[in-house]
Amino acid sequence: MFDRIDVAGEIQMTSQDSAKLHGIFSIPVYIAKRDSDLTSNEEKDISSIVKEGMGKNTGNSVSENSYIFNDKLEKIKEFCEQQLKIYVEQVIVPKKEVDFYITQSWLNITKPGEYHHLHTHQNSIISGVFYIAAEEDDKITFSDPNTKLKGMIKFEKKAYNTVNSDTWWFPSIANELVLFPSWLNHQVNVNEKATKDRISISFNTFARGKFGLRKDLNELILK
């Protein structure tokens, strides 16, 4: 079962005990905690990746090596793959056998005063971020793709929830993994209280197997 899954689900109405508000067409953001802390070998791998070179990104830095899971951080990769499998089985629920796998993977370093621009991940189905180091008030913020449609008429709100918000954030916690649809816009705002570097691993995924249906003329077989 999910360690924690955040979607717009049932919201209890305060006015009537028998009334419920249903959030349909929810966007699944999955968060899972790894039991073990960073090992000394993993710390060495992180240092090695940094020494290989860091390039400038819009607002922060990313590793020159964009396939870090290929030969480093084996246990973290294994954990991410296990959680990816759970996400696929319980969110996508594919009828046919489909093999999801990690494609590119890279290290992010966000120093105090830096940020990570609003973006999506192209050529990917599910994306993930695993936090190596984070401080209090570090967070990842997601943006509702339907904001333009829902915002045709604006109201001032006295409280925010997953139904009436244009953005929603989750705290960034060391040893936690966040999985989300690759098309979902997300960003990292400046943490004004930061005193240390925020370090994370991001990755993309794709799948092998059968997509679609032959009778609908949208079947795709990837091996």
Give residue spans per PLM region.
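Catalytic core of non-heme Fe(II) oxygenases with the double-stranded beta-helix
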Residues: T110-L179, K210-E219
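Short beta-strand His + acidic residue motifs that chelate non-heme Fe in jelly-roll/DSBH
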Residues: H116-H119, H186-K193
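A short hydrophobic beta-strand segment most commonly corresponding to one strand
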Residues: S127-F130, T195-F211
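Exposed beta-sheet edge/beta-hairpin loop segments within beta-rich domains
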Residues: W168-P171, V190-A194
